[in-house]
Amino acid sequence: MKNNILEELKWRGLIKQVTNEQKILDAQNSNDAVYCGFDPTADSLHVGHLMMIITLKRFALQGFKPIALIGGATGMIGDPSFKASERVLQTKQQVDHNINKISTQLKEIIPTVSFVNNRDWLEDISLIDFLRDIGKHFNLSYLLAKESIATRIQTGLSVTEFCYTMLQAFDFYYLYKNNDCSVQIGGSDQWGNITSGIDFISDTINKNNKASGVTINLLTKSDGQKFGKTESGAVWLDKTKTSEYEFYQFWFNQTDEDSINLLKCLTFLTKDQIEQLIKQHNQQPAKHFLQKALASEMTKFVHQQQGLDKALKLTEAFFSGDLFSLTDDLFKMALNSLPNTQINKDTKVIDALVELKVASSKREAREFLKNKAILINNQVIEDENLVISSFDLIQNKYLLVKKGKKKYFVILVK
């Protein structure tokens, strides 16, 4: 049974702007296609893309046919919208490699999605045809009035990037005409590009068309910071770049306030289910009901049940200290997720702590040991003169070092 897609988006706090609400609902009733564009700027999507991926899936669950447009052509240029400077241009080989990787990721997350590549229809348009058939419909003052372009004019905007909005407008026109696609969704920075597409359709096909668009709020943390970055950089959807364990921990480490917002924006839990979680969490905050639900839902969504099971096993092993039961596969995941270094088996604990960068100096290492802040294989260590070879090794080659409550390191004993 279909629910009103706009009501669903509204209670979750997702909508930034809508061009025409009635057209969106008409498109839902007609089971039209909806599309979202992804430019292949890297060989993996990251958590910053999840807002749009999940919104595309929400539309799919409410009767729309989901289309992921991969920008094989526009990705060669780069979207200037609200960017501080021009992107470094990628080679065609880089773009093709990224397209293959991203398409595979998206297909795993949204199995019903259809893929289109705008290179298929943009690559063969000659410069003369572009100027006559597309450029003719865009007034210069109209483009300069777009906030996404106006913000870059002062710092410098190349003709290449200036043409981007026209290419994206043509994408919407092409899908509207050939794929029964009447709705485009995008991030809050895409309003100018989406409305350009609708205006182009109005100008070239029919003023009384059914094209419409929705922009989605930028996901920010409660302190105003941009969401999705950590001290070590982006959190990727590719498990070879960000392991399932790291991915799970990223969500688990969100604040209570951010967790509530993320459960609404990024999961498919109902309003009642989220309210029940909040109630449980308020009664027993130490059990982290909100964070556990968020981390589980997100890890399962991106890495399926198998990926979630791996993350939970590793999390439980770290918490309980039962590291000897870990499979080699899981310990390799831990190794990729945690700071690690090779250390000689005859090295003293105090020297190993400095080598592993657990402590910045021997003096600091002694302080940690004195305060019982160092655990090796889950045993509190106080003797700085113990040598690495005196410990039982996990799988005959590893030691797990823990500093305080949350910081883990791995020693590869040689």
From Swiss-Prot:
A motif ('KMSKS' region) lies at residues 226-230. Keywords: Aminoacyl-tRNA synthetase, ATP-binding, Cytoplasm, Ligase, Nucleotide-binding, Protein biosynthesis, RNA-binding. Gene3D superfamilies: HUPs, RNA-binding S4 domain, Tyrosyl-Transfer RNA Synthetase. ATP binds at residue 229. GO terms for molecular function: ATP binding; RNA binding; tyrosine-tRNA ligase activity. One of its GO terms (cellular component) is cytosol. Disulfide bonds: none annotated. GO terms for biological process: tyrosyl-tRNA aminoacylation. L-tyrosine binds at residues 35, 164, 168. Residues 347-414 form the S4 RNA-binding domain. Its main location: cytoplasm. Transmembrane segments: none annotated. It is found in: Cytoplasm. It catalyses: tRNA(Tyr) + L-tyrosine + ATP = L-tyrosyl-tRNA(Tyr) + AMP + diphosphate + H(+). It holds the Pfam family tRNA-synt_1b. PROSITE patterns: AA_TRNA_LIGASE_I (PS00178), S4 (PS50889). Its EC number is 6.1.1.1. CDD domains: S4, TyrRS_core. A motif ('HIGH' region) lies at residues 40-49. Belongs to the class-I aminoacyl-tRNA synthetase family. TyrS type 1 subfamily. HAMAP family: Tyr_tRNA_synth_type1. Catalyzes the attachment of tyrosine to tRNA(Tyr) in a two-step reaction: tyrosine is first activated by ATP to form Tyr-AMP and then transferred to the acceptor end of tRNA(Tyr). Homodimer. This is Tyrosine--tRNA ligase. The lineage of its organism: Bacteria, Bacillati, Mycoplasmatota, Mollicutes, Mycoplasmataceae. The gene is tyrS.
